């Protein structure tokens, strides 16, 4: 059985992944918001603040959030299920994600693991803090029947 990865190395991988996902996400956010502001002012320079906010929420903010979620799901979910067996942050640090049998996870497990990540962080990050103890599994690992180990 491979050695399980502890809290701090996994935290560093998560931090690296956050940077990798944030850069393209914020570039997209900047482009969409810039186009929206220019378009909104050009179409009606006299709109009220309420009209502007409604347009912004429907035409810029919500689509941007949807794009950012899709980027995250694809990055975390598909890379975890790929031959790399983990994200770029995990690869850089020599880690991989495996199922309970020590094999590569399925696409469903990879995507499910991303959404379980969110659940792990909802209540004061307790689902992540669990990694520091016992079997070194976070809530997302337990839910998706995965573990992170050294290559």
Curated annotation (Swiss-Prot):
Keywords: Cell membrane, Membrane, Transmembrane, Transmembrane helix. The chain crosses the membrane at residues 12-32, 59-79, 114-134. It comes from the Bacteria. It is a multi-pass membrane protein. InterPro entries: Pra-immunoreactive (IPR051791), RDD (IPR010432). It is found in: Cell membrane. GO terms for cellular component: plasma membrane. It holds the Pfam family RDD. This is Uncharacterized protein YxaI. The gene is yxaI.
